Each structure stands twice: as structure tokens, then as C-alpha cells.
């Protein structure tokens, strides 16, 4: 198994690329290593499909828990469907790769990245993205690469290239940028309310590093004697496109320039134009060149009509600065926002609408035990904030089977989740687990940013004390040669026919999330910066409209939301609260009808819909963990009697025993002669034995009836801070 390994010195680290050793039947394969992280990436091409008009590309990212020396926790003890973070990494590979394949390619393509070893200092995702480019080049697939990706973090005032998981957690920025020799092709970022300029500088910083990795790939191909296969578009019959341009251009332009019509009216008008030209073609002689071209390629008419519509819409924007709905390039559609649209049994709700895009978001408050446990390679194994995004078929007027969430739904939900995370309250002040669900009720572009806005409305309605409200806007771009137009708040047709989908979310203070996808092979950092800056006034305009619906979080939680009490106990006493086999804590929860969670650090969280019940449970736990000293005096009730003595509950949940010899100064023959179950007595702690058992006495202790002589009962100790 011979192979060739080449090393790249990159930012003070060594990246090792091994080719020719692994997966010999794949079209191309490379093992990318940095530190102890190793990712095997393969690219394979099979024969073309007949009758399709899209690129059948599949990008998969596979995690194996052996990479971290772990055995899966499932019943079968093997990996099953990819976890959410693996799905997001697969999308991270797909998004910069897809626009670099030629639009005419119809071969089945599959890129598979498998994490074989994980070093927590070196996240595997960006290595997988760069490896995907290398494997594709080695496979000889037509590809407008090379392409590479890096991660940029921000620690203090310094940018960090490819930070560790710990540095990402500590920093204010987690940005992944991918690029080609032509420019930036993908950006994905989460930020702690950073100013636009900081994010732009981070993208520029990352692209400079990308250029080094691109040169390294070019050198690798040269050393291996491989010539890159550049896409060469096959000759196409222009008969049908030319005919449509002559017959339909004026009619299509008239539809696109009628700004007072709705989306449905515009779509219907375009279908009418298409139907009329179809009838005209049907009336042509059978030996007409157009009829013959369509006979060999039935989808050519629809594709050519779509291409002509795209061309004319883009010309209208570039030349006239007008969009299909009459808006200017930097104009936002009409905004509507409402909070509390559902009954209060739903803890919080918000309805956000921008143009024809409408999203209903709901917020649910849960207890710490509702946190999501993540069984993947990421060191952070628990999620306290969840955002789920649903996109039903009726939102676009279609019918199809309702299935489990796909990659798109998972990706959009993760973006909206990321946008809100930086403004959530700290766990110490708001210990709830929070789940937001965004239901897309109508879609005409930018539903993910609509979900961000809906999330803010629902969280504020639920009484979550956000550090700042967050809104989002989607930017688009039309580029022909050196001519560039950036569009604010793109709608569906502009997303579909444009060159960029750039989503920016943030507060008044700064950016919290950013995602950019391209349909061209790259964009200059300067143009990216213009889009980032143009998004700010749009975000703030949307935020202003949202704050008209609700400007501060509600003072009170929904009466149907759980009430949480959180306090700290000595971690060494956690076992005392839990009890043998969990009997003690189970008894407390059953007695008080509460839900109790205890963390390893000693933080106790009690959840209940009844505040008094939660306080009762807190008193019991504080009593169990309260240190009792010899000589202290307590008042309590007799809970049970045994032949040699009686037990007294001196603190909630904590008992001590009075031996029969300590019941009276005189000799006692039978315990019941002195006390009975339920009697209130005052006792002194005589001793605490080496097993922690509390021994009590009544001897010499004044009882009720001579209260003036009774020593005061000590005040319970406050929770440990």
C-alpha cells in the first residue's frame, strides 16, 4: 500500500496530505491530517443521468466515535443516522463545492468525508472542506477549483486561524470562510454582537490564508503529475433559445416591469406567455428546426424560457435599478410583527411577516433535564437552547408527503439558533432550557431570517430576558462582468435567479450570525464588505418594526411555564440528597410534586408549576445538606418509634434519634410512656457518630410550656453562594 505524503506548513502547523494509499477504487482520495485529527475524503463520479436538469451532487460527512476513543451509547452500540452537527458539516462541504461544478454537468457525484481521528485542538470540518477540493481534483472531475476553507476566531483583539474547540468557546467569533482564486465562495459565522468592520476584517484575514492553501493544492497536482480538468461547456443547439428570445422577450419584460402585481399574478402571467409560445411552436411544421430540437430534448423549452426570464430580470436590475416588485435595490418589503398570538398555554409566540414570507415561532421553557444530549464527536455534549425549523409544502402552495426534517430544514434551524445564542441570558440567572419552533406558513424568500425575527418575538413574549433583540435580513447580488448590484431583502425569484444568498442577523450592537452562499465561482472581499454594510440599515429597520409589537421581555412567565428555583449545595453532599438508589430524591419529588436536577458542581434546580411546592422542596434539600453541630437545639416532631428510642425530624428531611436512656432523667421502661408519633419536642444534639448519625437528647432540655427557658431554634443556613 504505497502512497505519497506531502506536508504543508500552515500558520505554524503542519498539514499532511496522503494520496494513493486509501480507498483505491474511489475516483480520488486524500487523507488530511493536522495534529491528531485525520479526515479521509473521497470523490467519485459515475455515469450521467438522462432526463434531469440539475447536478446530482451528494456531499456526506461521517463521524465515527472511535475517532475519539468512544463506543456509541445506542442499544446497538454502533453509529446510526448522522447527528445534527455532522449534517451541518456535510452542508458546509456542499455549499462551496456545488457552484464550482459546471452547470451542464449531469453525472452523479459523491463526496464523502470520514473523520477517522479527532484532536480537540483541531476541528475536522474545515479540513474536510479543503480535502473535498483535493479529492475532486484527483478524481479528474471538471471543477472550477482549487477551493479551500479556514476557520477564523477572535480572542481579545487578535484573530486566530483554525482555533481549537476551547478557543472557539472562549472567543467572540466563529467564522468559516471558503474561497477560490476568484474570491470568496462561502461564509458561515456566529459572532458575539460584533461590529460589521470586525467581521469584514476577519473574512479578509481568512481569505489571505485560503490563498496559501490554494497554492499548496496547485503544487500537489504538479508534484503528482496531474493536470486539472477544467470545465469546457459542450456545444449546445441555440435554435430554441434564439427563437424564444425573438418571440417572448417583449412579453416577458412587460410582465417583469409590471410592478403592481402580486407574486401569483406574475407567475400566472409568465406561465401564460410560456403557454402561448408553446402553442405557437405546436403550430410549426414538424420539420421546423425548433420542433426537431424539442423532440430530442423535451425539457429544453422550459429551461430556455427560465434562462431567458433570468436574463431579462437581471438586465432590468442592472440597467434600470428596478426589481420585479418595483422596489429599489436597498428597499425592504412591508413588515408586520405580532407577539402573543397564541394562548398562554404556549409559553411564548410571535408572528413575523415580510412581504409574502410569514413565520410563526413559539417558545417553550423547560427544565435542565430537558437539555439535549449530543452523542457526537464535539466536546460540548449538551444543548440548552434549541431551534427547530419546519417548512411544510403548503407554504409554497404545493402538495407532497410530510417527512422528517431534511438537510435544508436542519441548516435553516441551526442558522436561526446561532443568531439568538449570543443574546440569551446566562444560565445562572435564567436556568431554563429553551426550545423555539419556527413554522414557515408562507415562503417567498428569506424564511431563515424570518425565523430569527419570529424567535425574538416569541422569546420576549415568553419572558426570556434577552440581552438584546435580534433581527435578520437576506441580501442578494446580480453580477455581470464588472457590473454588480447588491439587493436588500431578496424574495424567492431573486434568490432563484440571482448570484448570491447572503443572510445577516444581529442586534443594534452588531452581528450575531452570518451565512453567504454563491452561485458563481467567487466574489471579492470588497463586494462582500459592501453587502455586509448594506444589510445593517435593513436589519435595524426590521428591528424597529418588531419593537413596535413588543419592546421588552414580558415581566411574568406564562402561568403554564414551570417555575424554577436554583441554588447551590456542597458537592460532597449530593449523595446525601440523592440517597441510596435514589430513594431520598425520589421521595422529595413525590412529596412535593416537583422535578429536581442536580449538577456535578452542586447546582440544584427545582421545577414546579406551584411556587410553594418548589420552596418546600428547597427547604427539605437545605435541611438535608445543613451541617448539624453538637450542642445545637432544635424543635421537631416524632416521626417514628422503635423499641430502643424515637426519631425526630429536626430539619426538613433530616432525622436524629433519641435513645430510650435520653428520654428522661428518670428510668424509662417503654418509649411510648414518654413520647408518641406526632409529638412536638425540643431536643439537643448530644453527638454525631463516625457514621454521621445524629444522636439527640431530651434530658435537661426545657419543653414547650416553659418556652421562655427554651434555647432559640437556629435559623436555617442560606444556600451556598
UniProtKB/Swiss-Prot annotation:
Localization per Swiss-Prot or TrEMBL: Cytoplasm
Residue span(s) of domain S1 motif: 631-699
Reactions it catalyzes: RNA(n+1) + phosphate = RNA(n) + a ribonucleoside 5'-diphosphate
Ranges for domain KH: 562-621
Entry-linked CDD domains: KH-I_PNPase, RNase_PH_PNPase_1, RNase_PH_PNPase_2
Source organism, top-level taxon: Bacteria
Annotated family: Belongs to the polyribonucleotide nucleotidyltransferase family.
Name of the protein in its database record: Polyribonucleotide nucleotidyltransferase
Organism of derivation: Synechococcus sp. (strain CC9605)
Gene: pnp
Amino acid at each position: 500500500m504505497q502512497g505519497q505524503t506531502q506536508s504543508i506548513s500552515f500558520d505554524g502547523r503542519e498539514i499532511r496530505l496522503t494520496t494513493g494509499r486509501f480507498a483505491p477504487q474511489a475516483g480520488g482520495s486524500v487523507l488530511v491530517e493536522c495534529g491528531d485529527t485525520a479526515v479521509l475524503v473521497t470523490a467519485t463520479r459515475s455515469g450521467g443521468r438522462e432526463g434531469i436538469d440539475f447536478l446530482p451532487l451528494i456531499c456526506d460527512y461521517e463521524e465515527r466515535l472511535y475517532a475519539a476513543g468512544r463506543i456509541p451509547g445506542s442499544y446497538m452500540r454502533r453509529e446510526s443516522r448522522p447527528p445534527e452537527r455532522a449534517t451541518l458539516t456535510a452542508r458546509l462541504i456542499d455549499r462551496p463545492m456545488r457552484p464550482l461544478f459546471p452547470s451542464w454537468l449531469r453525472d452523479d457525484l459523491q463526496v464523502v468525508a470520514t473523520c477517522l481521528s479527532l484532536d480537540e485542538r483541531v476541528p475536522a470540518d474545515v479540513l474536510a472542506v479543503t480535502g473535498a477540493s483535493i479529492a475532486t481534483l484527483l478524481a479528474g472531475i471538471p471543477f472550477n477549483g482549487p477551493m479551500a476553507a479556514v476557520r477564523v476566531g477572535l480572542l481579545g483583539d487578535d484573530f486566530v486561524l483554525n482555533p481549537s474547540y476551547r478557543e472557539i468557546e472562549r472567543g467572540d467569533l466563529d467564522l468559516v470562510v471558503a474561497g477560490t482564486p476568484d474570491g470568496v465562495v462561502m461564509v458561515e459565522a456566529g459572532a458575539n454582537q460584533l461590529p460589521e468592520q470586525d467581521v469584514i476584517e476577519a473574512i479578509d484575514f481568512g481569505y489571505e490564508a485560503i490563498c496559501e492553501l490554494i497554492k499548496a493544492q496547485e503544487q500537489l497536482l504538479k508534484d503528482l503529475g496531474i493536470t486539472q480538468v477544467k470545465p469546457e461547456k459542450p456545444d449546445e443547439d441555440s435554435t430554441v433559445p434564439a427563437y424564444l428570445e425573438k418571440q417572448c422577450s417583449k412579453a416577458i419584460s412587460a410582465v417583469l416591469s409590471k410592478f403592481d402585481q402580486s407574486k401569483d399574478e406574475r407567475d400566472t402571467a409568465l406561465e401564460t406567455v410560456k403557454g402561448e409560445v408553446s402553442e405557437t411552436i405546436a403550430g410549426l411544421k414538424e420539420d421546423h428546426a425548433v420542433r426537431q430540437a424539442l423532440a430530442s430534448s423535451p425539457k429544453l423549452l422550459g429551461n430556455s424560457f427560465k434562462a431567458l426570464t433570468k436574463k431579462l430580470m437581471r438586465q432590468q436590475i442592472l440597467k434600470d435599478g428596478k426589481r420585479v416588485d418595483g422596489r429599489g435595490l436597498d428597499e425592504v418589503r412591508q413588515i408586520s410583527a405580532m407577539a402573543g398570538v397564541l394562548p398562554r398555554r404556549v409559553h411564548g409566540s410571535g408572528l413575523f411577516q415580510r412581504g409574502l414570507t410569514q413565520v410563526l415561532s413559539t417558545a417553550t421553557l423547560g427544565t435542565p433535564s430537558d437539555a439535549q444530549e449530543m452523542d457526537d464527536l464535539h466536546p460540548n455534549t449538551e444543548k440548552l437552547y434549541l431551534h427547530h425549523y419546519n417548512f411544510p409544502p403548503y407554504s409554497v402552495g404545493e402538495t407532497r408527503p410530510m417527512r422528517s426534517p431534511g438537510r435544508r430544514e436542519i441548516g435553516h434551524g441551526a442558522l436561526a439558533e446561532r443568531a439568538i445564542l449570543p443574546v440569551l441570558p446566562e444560565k445562572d440567572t435564567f436556568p431554563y432550557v429553551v426550545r423555539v419552533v419556527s413554522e414557515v406558513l408562507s415562503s417567498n424568500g428569506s424564511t431563515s431570517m424570518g425565523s430569527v425575527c419570529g424567535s425574538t418575538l416569541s422569546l420576549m413574549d415568553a419572558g426570556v430576558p434577552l440581552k438584546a433583540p435580534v433581527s435578520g435580513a437576506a441580501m442578494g447580488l446580480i453580477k455581470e462582468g464588472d457590473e454588480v448590484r447588491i439587493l436588500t431583502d431578496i424574495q424567492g425569484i431573486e434568490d432563484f435567479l440571482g448570484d448570491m444568498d447572503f443572510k445577516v442577523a444581529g442586534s443594534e450592537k452588531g452581528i450575531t450570525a452570518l451565512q453567504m452562499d454563491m452561485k458563481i465561482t467567487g466574489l471579492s472581499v470588497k463586494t462582500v464588505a459592501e453587502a455586509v454594510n448594506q444589510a445593517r440599515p435593513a436589519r435595524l429597520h426590521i428591528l424597529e418594526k418588531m419593537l413596535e409589537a413588543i419592546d421588552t421581555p414580558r415581566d411574568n412567565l406564562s402561568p403554564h411555564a414551570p417555575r424554577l428555583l436554583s441554588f447551590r449545595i456542597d458537592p460532597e453532599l449530593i449523595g446525601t440528597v440523592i440517597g441510596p438508589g435514589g430513594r431520598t430524591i425520589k421521595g422529595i419529588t413525590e412529596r412535593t410534586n416537583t422535578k429536581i436536577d442536580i449538577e456535578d458542581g452542586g447546582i440544584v434546580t427545582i421545577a414546579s408549576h406551584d411556587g410553594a411546592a418548589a420552596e418546600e422542596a428547597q427547604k427539605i434539600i437545605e435541611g438535608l445538606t445543613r451541617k448539624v453541630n453538637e450542642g445545637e437545639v432544635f424543635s421537631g416532631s416524632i416521626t417514628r418509634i422503635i423499641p430502643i428510642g424515637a426519631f425526630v425530624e429536626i430539619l426538613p428531611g433530616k432525622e436524629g434519634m433519641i435513645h430510650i436512656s435520653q428520654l428522661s432523667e428518670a428510668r424509662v421502661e417503654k418509649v411510648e410512656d414518654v413520647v408518641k408519633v406526632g409529638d412536638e419536642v425540643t431536643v439537643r444534639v448530644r453527638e454525631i457518630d463516625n457514621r454521621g448519625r445524629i444522636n439527640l437528647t431530651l434530658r435537661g432540655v426545657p419543653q414547650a410550656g416553659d418556652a421562655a427557658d427554651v434555647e432559640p431554634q437556629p435559623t436555617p443556613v442560606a444556600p451556598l453562594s
